Amino acid sequence: MLDYETLDAIADAYTPLLGGLWLLLAVSPLPRGQWRLAALRIALGLTTLVVCYGLMFADKALGIWPALGLDYSTHSAVAIAAVGILGTLLPRLRPTWIASLLAYFALMLYQRYHSLADIATTAAVIAPPVVWLCMRFAPHVAPIGHRQPAPQP
């Protein structure tokens, strides 16, 4: 079995790895002169991060999770956002992204970073806006063969 420090290093590398992959996918259209596509992919990522960190700041100011005896899991929120983005940009790999997220949650529980309630409540609040954003952006940012018509208001 891997020791705590090794598992800690793996956990610490997870979201930066996903973030780096998002950035790579976001800028990959630039060599083909697809500035708008790159800008939309970057906007999707930044918007989901605003949701994650905006809720973190709201929790710090209002003490929402502590009032329930819980802790807002920024790690979980950012991981959910990253998996949502990657699932939008690389839809064929969506099951892999989701499996990696579940494994990350299990690792956080094993390492005692957060409780199941911390992760579940964070996911319950973060997932809906992230999924909505990904679905809204998908027609504009997904690979050509996977683009759907934009939803009508």
Predicted regions and their residues:
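Membrane-interface junctions at the ends of membrane-embedded or membrane-associated helices
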Residues: 89-95, 136-144
